A protein has these predicted regions:
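Conserved catalytic neighborhood of penicillin-recognizing serine enzymes
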Residues: 114-118, 122
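Extracytoplasmic ligand-binding site segments that recognize negatively charged/polar headgroups
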Residues: 140-153
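Cell-wall glycan-active module
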Residues: 1-112, 127-134, 139, 154-228
Length: 228
């Protein structure tokens, strides 16, 4: 894998991070046990605390309306969708994971079940180390997702945005993470001003964020409640 990474343009820091990885049993355990995506929509909303996310989301939007308005002006994505994703993924940053990002992604790349899917994200993670966006010690979720909205590294590297103007892209910074989320959705085909409920044009873009139907439905419903 090191030779492949070098061929993809990964530098010394990234290769060093790759060589320091270990096999993550916690990652494999989590990958084999994603029960919540098999729930009914009603149970999924209950288990994920949808009412609390909506309540906190409305409060967050009311406290910082200019920030969310600026994101919608720039990318066309309404606040409700971004806030719902933020709440669903990390409880608004309250828990962003406890697993080494590079080791998690390397483990999933090694694991033959979905190697082809995770290999580009491993390259992305190593390039992020090279760029100083993360370090070999950075922690995230069990599948290597990182930051406030849990981006896989390949997407974080490709779509990352400096949302607070400090010259860096840091997905552990809320402004950067939400701007990056909005940019990702726009780049995936979000149509400003169009609806995002099931059957409307932008619902298909929520599918680009997460492949689970129940998750897509939950984000659409919570987003509408927050925006309403």
């Amino acid at each position: 894998m090191a030779a492949e990474a070098k061929a993809e343009g990964v530098g010394k820091r990234g290769i060093d991070a790759l060589m320091a990885t270990g096999y993550s049993k916690a990652t494999i355990g989590a990958d084999r046990n994603q029960k919540s995506f098999k729930y009914s929509l009603e149970k999924f909303l209950d288990v994920r605390g949808a009412d609390a996310i909506v309540s906190q989301g409305r409060s967050r939007k009311a406290k910082n309306p200019d920030f969310y308005a600026s994101l919608e002006a720039a990318y066309g994505v309404p606040a409700g969708v971004l806030i719902a994703i933020h709440g669903m993924e990390t409880g608004f940053g309250s828990f962003m994971g406890d697993t080494n990002v590079v080791s998690a992604i390397a483990t999933l790349t090694y694991d033959c079940r979905r190697s082809d899917f995770f290999r580009p994200h491993l390259i992305g993670a190593l390039k992020m180390v090279d760029a100083g966006m993360i370090s070999m010690e950075t922690v995230g979720a069990k599948h290597g997702e990182l930051g406030h909205t849990q981006f896989l590294p390949g997407n974080a590297f490709k779509y990352g945005v400096d949302g607070n103007g400090d010259g860096q892209v840091d997905l552990y910074n809320q402004a950067d993470a939400l701007a990056t989320t909005a940019n990702y959705l726009r780049q995936k085909g979000w149509k400003p001003g169009k609806g995002y409920q099931e059957g409307e044009p932008n619902f298909a873009v929520i599918k680009e964020w997460n492949a689970a139907k129940v998750y897509q439905q939950a984000i659409a419903l919570m987003g509408a409640r927050i925006d309403g």
